[in-house]
Structure formats: structure tokens, C-alpha cells
Regions:
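Intrinsically disordered, low-complexity terminal tails and inter-domain linkers enriched
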Residues: 4-16, 44-55, 216-240
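Short, well-ordered alpha-helices that flank and scaffold nucleotide-derived cofactor binding pockets
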Residues: 78, 113, 117, 191, ...
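N-terminal beta-alpha supersecondary unit
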Residues: 12-95
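Surface "functional belts" at beta-alpha junctions
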Residues: 14-18, 23-25, 46-55, 61-67, ...
Length: 267
């Protein structure tokens, strides 16, 4: 298990590991491929005498580089097996919709959409940067590696998004008025960030928080904790961590360019 995922769990208290499925519950399969990692988790929200609780039945992560298409399906099979569940037990799918590089991000979103269609269950998209920023106190920016010497970023104040998501040169983060920057982009451009980079923060979106944001905003009950998102999607402002349709958030065109029409040859 990736250490950054574990640290995010410690930050967010409502999750408990090992709750049995003896109470009315919703089982969510969460995944994210917006970064260099493939991450997945099985999270359960259960109704009990003490109210609603969420727990992590299993989670896994693997640094994929550009092998998301090869590694995601085995990762999902493994995390379901770890949780003692089968794919038919899943009640909803939550997926990080980016922003992220074209190929890796598309793998996760297409897989989540296909699972939802095959199982007849809803698929909820979550901004992948929110899955990091929602659990962090204070004024913080989350930066992912956008390649081309750029970062995907969003800014948060006590778990509420106040700017972004956007794609820019890393120097733009110096103008946000944040106290620290976390994520893979912060690590990659630590020298540019002049002491704002926090290497102890999460590097990749924790799948547990992808599930939590989906549970809190998809109308399944409750709110998204520190994120403060409420109810079904609407026209929420930037400070509201709203649910999203499972559509990739690329923010820019892919590197690959489709060939133009064939040129006519004249005599």
C-alpha cells in the first residue's frame, strides 16, 4: 500500500477498517488513474444505531507510469478479493475524473463507466485534486504532474476548494497565497516553489477519499465531511466540492494529434 494513501486515512477520522456488512450498507468501488499511480479501494457506508459510518474494506495502489491500461483490471480484482467481495456486490462506482494526462485518465474513466453499465449501478465522478485537498487543513494547493513542465492544480482552505482546477507553469502556485503545496507536482518542482513544497503530503489521490466524496455528494446520504458538499450536483461555486459526471477533465488537448486529410496529388 502506498504510504501517501495511508497518511490520508490518518487525516480523515470517519473511516474505520474492518466493519462487517451486517447493517444496511452501500458498497463503493473507488478508483483513480489521473496520476502516475493506479489506486483502488472498496469502501462501505453502513447504517447503524450510532448513525452512518464509513469503513475501508480494502485498498491498493501501484505506481503505473504509463501502464494504467495493463495494471488497472488486476488491481481491481485484487482489491475486491482483499475485501472479501465480488464485483456483483458493488452498489456504486466512484472514479477520479482528473485533471490528468489523456491516456491514463481515460483508462480509469472508461473502466468505471463500463463497470457501471455492466452492473447497472451509478458511476460518480470526483475531481482527483479534491480527493487530496479535502482532507487537508489550512491554506494548501494540490499540484499534479501535467508534463510539459506544467502542473494541474487547485487551491483549498480548510478542505474547501477556492481556486482551480487549472493547468499552469508551477510558478503560478507562488501567487496563490497558500502555506504549502502537496502532490506529485510539488515534489517534482520543489526548487521552483521556494520552500512551499511539502514532501510529507499525499502524492496521489487516495481512493478512499474518492469514495468518500462520492458518497457525500451523490445523494446516498450525509455530507462530505470537511468538504462541506451537500446533496445532488448543481451549480456550486469553486469552494464546493461538487460531484461530477464521469467525464475526463483534461484541461488541455492531448499530445497526440490526429492526422489531417490526405493531400491530393496533382500532375
Amino acid at each position: 500500500m502506498c504510504g501517501s494513501v495511508g497518511s490520508a486515512l490518518e487525516l480523515y477520522a470517519p473511516f474505520r477498517v474492518g466493519m462487517s456488512r451486517t447493517l444496511p450498507s452501500v458498497l463503493v468501488l473507488a478508483l483513480d488513474t489521473s496520476s502516475a499511480a493506479c489506486v483502488a479501494a472498496v469502501v462501505e457506508r453502513a447504517e447503524g444505531h450510532a448513525g452512518r459510518r464509513e469503513c475501508v474494506l480494502a485498498q491498493r495502489s501501484v505506481v503505473a507510469g504509463r501502464r494504467h491500461g495493463e495494471l488497472l483490471a488486476p488491481l481491481l480484482s485484487s482489491v475486491l478479493a482483499d475485501a472479501g467481495q465480488q464485483v456483483r456486490d458493488v452498489d456504486a462506482v466512484a472514479v477520479g475524473v482528473g485533471p490528468g494526462p489523456f491516456t491514463g485518465l481515460r483508462v480509469g474513466v472508461v473502466t468505471a463507466t463500463a463497470l457501471g453499465q455492466a452492473l447497472g449501478v451509478p458511476v460518480h465522478g470526483v475531481c482527483s485534486l479534491d480527493a487530496i485537498g479535502a482532507a487537508l487543513p489550512g491554506r494548501v494547493a494540490v499540484a499534479g504532474d501535467a508534463r510539459r513542465r506544467e502542473v494541474y492544480w487547485a487551491a483549498y482552505e480548510d478542505g474547501k476548494r477556492v481556486a482551480g482546477p487549472a493547468v499552469d507553469r508551477p510558478q503560478v502556485l507562488l501567487e496563490l497565497g497558500v502555506d504549502r503545496v502537496v502532490g506529485a507536482g510539488a515534489t517534482l518542482y520543489a526548487e521552483v516553489l521556494l520552500g512551499l513544497a511539502d514532501p510529507t503530503g499525499p502524492q496521489y489521490p487516495p481512493p478512499v477519499l474518492v469514495a468518500h466524496l462520492a458518497l457525500g455528494t451523490a445523494g446516498t446520504a450525509g455530507t462530505a465531511g470537511a468538504a462541506g458538499a451537500e446533496g445532488l450536483p448543481g451549480t456550486a461555486g469553486p469552494d464546493r466540492l461538487s460531484p461530477a459526471p464521469p467525464i475526463p477533465l483534461y484541461l488541455r488537448r492531448p499530445d497526440a494529434v490526429l492526422p489531417g486529410p490526405a493531400k491530393r496529388v496533382t500532375a
